[in-house]
Amino acid sequence: MDTKKFRGSRTCGGGTHKNRRGAGNRGGRGKAGGCKHHFVRAMMRGYSYGKHGFKRPDEVSRDVSIVNVGELDELASYLVEEGLAEVKDGAYHINLENLGIEKVLGSGRVTKNLVVTSEEFSASAREKIENAGGSCIDAE
């Protein structure tokens, strides 16, 4: 707002000098009227009140450590160097149980021949590993 045009004006566009006095002209102080006369404004601005949704109990939910096949493909040679995997018959043998990983997911590309041992595989991960000439071994 251009304030220059209010220079020399006593009330700067606020009407008479009484109009900007007190809290009554602005509907109360602070959060007053939040559930009464300011509620309509809050609804129009999209604020929401109260509880929403559902929170799952911690006993029900569990965190699964995962890895994507694309990451496995990139890290295969590094894992061999570190002694966490081995190469047999031209295939990288990776046991994910020893690494503390429970599930293999299918994001990424597989270019190497991988033989992966894990508790769980997603359908796309299993498909990509087997299409590249590798195999998936279910650990129990």
Swiss-Prot record:
GO terms for molecular function: rRNA binding; structural constituent of ribosome. Gene3D superfamilies: 3.100.10.10, 4.10.990.10. GO terms for biological process: translation. It comes from the Archaea. The keyword rRNA-binding applies. It holds the Pfam family Ribosomal_L27A. Keywords: Ribonucleoprotein, Ribosomal protein, RNA-binding, rRNA-binding. Residues 1-32 are annotated as: Disordered. One of its GO terms (cellular component) is cytosolic large ribosomal subunit. Binds to the 23S rRNA. Belongs to the universal ribosomal protein uL15 family. Part of the 50S ribosomal subunit. HAMAP family: Ribosomal_uL15. This is Large ribosomal subunit protein uL15. The lineage of its organism: Archaea, Methanobacteriati, Methanobacteriota, Stenosarchaea group, Methanomicrobia. The gene is rpl15.
